[in-house]
Amino acid sequence: MKNSMYLPFPSKGLYAITPDRLQGDALLAAAESAILGGAAVVQYRPKSGPASDRLSDGIRLQELCRTAGIPLIVNDSPRLAAEIGADGVHLGKNDGSVAAARHVLGDRAIVGISCYDSLERALRAEAEGANYVAFGALFPSATKPCASRARLETLREAGTRLQIPIAAIGGIDTTNAGQVIGAGADLVAAVEAVFGAADVARAARELCSLFHAPRKRRPRCDDA
């Protein structure tokens, strides 16, 4: 089912991404704690398990996020996002186009694009109507140990060229999140730094505390 009441994507904050190992009640409890800690958006990232379980967990997550007033994004699959009634989808390089995702989800759905270390890919995604882009991995990642690395310099340049929100991902925790925020990231995306913590709400709160007042509009290079 298509969601008829999509929530907007946040302009800044913590982007909490659920790990595949959490399912059922454990997934819901951890996600609720992340939201209580201040997460601005949650991404559901199921990579294994029966399709029926992914669907039922996703529906419960969507209900939780909707009650909290924050968007739920589904990783990789516009079809699963539509079945759940999620607010949007996050696409990697092999997951299809912005237009294809909107055909499944509707024109008001959130569509985010992984851009790795490619500013060109990010500019193209923005031109195609993406709601946000993500760069990474900025640091060694336990979730994706073989992921290619992105540079802080790419974040800095993206901050002067893009008007849509920029998320940073990959090995981000409280020791380095300040670097990526300072380099231009509007959101920090985290899996283990949040859901691997003994106190999920506290971990989320500590990451959220690194954000300051909303930024003014970023200048484009052609504004001069």
From Swiss-Prot:
One of its GO terms (molecular function) is magnesium ion binding. Binds 1 Mg(2+) ion per subunit. 2-[(2R,5Z)-2-carboxy-4-methylthiazol-5(2H)-ylidene]ethyl phosphate binds at residues 141-143, 171. Its cofactor is Mg(2+). It catalyses: 2-[(2R,5Z)-2-carboxy-4-methylthiazol-5(2H)-ylidene]ethyl phosphate + 4-amino-2-methyl-5-(diphosphooxymethyl)pyrimidine + 2 H(+) = thiamine phosphate + CO2 + diphosphate; 2-(2-carboxy-4-methylthiazol-5-yl)ethyl phosphate + 4-amino-2-methyl-5-(diphosphooxymethyl)pyrimidine + 2 H(+) = thiamine phosphate + CO2 + diphosphate; 4-methyl-5-(2-phosphooxyethyl)-thiazole + 4-amino-2-methyl-5-(diphosphooxymethyl)pyrimidine + H(+) = thiamine phosphate + diphosphate. Gene3D superfamilies: Aldolase class I (3.20.20.70). InterPro entries: Aldolase_TIM, ThiamineP_synth_sf, ThiamineP_synth_TenI, TMP_synthase. Its EC number is 2.5.1.3. 4-amino-2-methyl-5-(diphosphooxymethyl)pyrimidine binds at residues 43-47, 75, 114, 144. Pathway: Cofactor biosynthesis; thiamine diphosphate biosynthesis; thiamine phosphate from 4-amino-2-methyl-5-diphosphomethylpyrimidine and 4-methyl-5-(2-phosphoethyl)-thiazole: step 1/1. One of its GO terms (biological process) is thiamine diphosphate biosynthetic process. Pfam families: TMP-TENI. Condenses 4-methyl-5-(beta-hydroxyethyl)thiazole monophosphate (THZ-P) and 2-methyl-4-amino-5-hydroxymethyl pyrimidine pyrophosphate (HMP-PP) to form thiamine monophosphate (TMP). Belongs to the thiamine-phosphate synthase family. This is Thiamine-phosphate synthase. The lineage of its organism: Bacteria, Pseudomonadati, Pseudomonadota, Gammaproteobacteria, Methylococcales.
